[in-house]
Amino acid sequence: MKLLLFNDYRLGVLKGDRVVDVTRVVPGADHLPKTALGGEAIMETVIGDFDSLRAGLESAAGQEEGAPLADLRIRPPLPRPPNALCAFSNYQDRDTAEPRPPVYNLDFFHKSATSIVGYDDLVELPDLPEAIVFQPEPEFAYVMGKRARNVPEASALDYVFGYMNFVDISARGIPNRRTTFLHKSQETWAPMGPVIVTKDEIQDPQNVRVRLWLNGELR
């Protein structure tokens, strides 16, 4: 299932190039504020109670044709996540001149809540004279389905709800940086979406093609 938030943070299911509104399936959704926080609450309810809500979501999605995706304002599927954690070392198996040794002690950084925007929203580049270049990095994001800590590798995917596109915007060349905020976490620097794809739809998350379009151009 492909889940998204649209317009005033309604919950939708993407079918082809059309979106069906399934907000009514989520208990209490219509009483939440039509804001990023309200949308986050809806999606977190779906993630937390997906086993019990799935049949209703599938039924509701099958009853309507839906609206064209292109006619809707697509919001980030997790507009205010409690934690947006990114790793500095990704894609260890990519083609390089020299093989890379495995990384066992990863270093992480956070994206701020205000850095998160929808996949088609405008990314704002502030005046940072020290920055040599602003770089968008396409990422394959894991959406956690429950709390996890000290999880064995063999059962790691049991904690995953689904996956989504994510872009890490970085300002390169800033000298003497002591934190990641200035070059990683400013407003609009974390586009995501348009959808969360539930785990059952992707057989092997280690074998997914990740591509990036910048201003309509494939990079």
Language-model features and meaning:
Residues M1-L106, D200-Q203:
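N-terminal non-catalytic cap/leader segment that marks the start of a structured domain
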Residues R75, P81-R219:
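Glycine-enriched loop-and-adjacent helix/strand subsegments that border the catalytic/binding cleft
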